[in-house]
């Protein structure tokens, strides 16, 4: 599994923990992480995430994380993670202050959450959201 990390906004160097983010995404992808596939983790600012959210999801506001699954381009690769995870650094800073935790942990939480979506988890119902939050927390404690 190839996991690429891109910083498309100014993220201070002490928060650019690429290996940590890759470990979180890999752990969230679980059994898929050892297979073929490629995931891009892209850190963006509030303006960019708002634009993506409006253009692709028809939501006119900024958000914390957005994931997109793409069809796997190789024969026999259907169902393998292949996609983009957009994490908003600005929202991570705001929410870290609001929730009283570190910015890095907030960024990692969003990266793991996005990867869980690529692995097939959903958070459309309260029960699903709770399961996803539990799994996110378990993964963060593990890495």
From Swiss-Prot:
Note describing how the cofactor binds: Binds 1 zinc ion.
Localization terms from the record: Cytoplasm
NCBIfam families attached to this UniProt entry: rRNA maturation RNase YbeY (TIGR00043)
UniProt family annotation: Belongs to the endoribonuclease YbeY family.
Predominant localisation class: cytoplasm
PANTHER family assigned to the protein according to its UniProt record, in alphabetical order: ENDORIBONUCLEASE YBEY, CHLOROPLASTIC
Organism encoding this protein: Elusimicrobium minutum (strain Pei191)
UniProt-listed Enzyme Commission number(s): 3.1.-.-
GO MF entries: metalloendopeptidase activity; RNA endonuclease activity; zinc ion binding
Name of the protein in its database record: Endoribonuclease YbeY
GO biological process: rRNA processing
Protein purpose: Single strand-specific metallo-endoribonuclease involved in late-stage 70S ribosome quality control and in maturation of the 3' terminus of the 16S rRNA.
The encoding gene: ybeY
Residues given in the record as Zn(2+) binding sites: 113, 117, 123
Sorted UniProt keywords: Cytoplasm, Endonuclease, Hydrolase, Metal-binding, Nuclease, Ribosome biogenesis, rRNA processing, Zinc
A Pfam cross-reference name: YbeY
Cofactor (UniProt): Zn(2+)
Class of the enzyme per the UniProt entry, highest EC level: hydrolase
Hydrolase keyword on record: yes
Classification via Gene3D superfamilies: Metalloproteases ('zincins'), catalytic domain
A cellular component annotation (GO) from this entry: cytoplasm
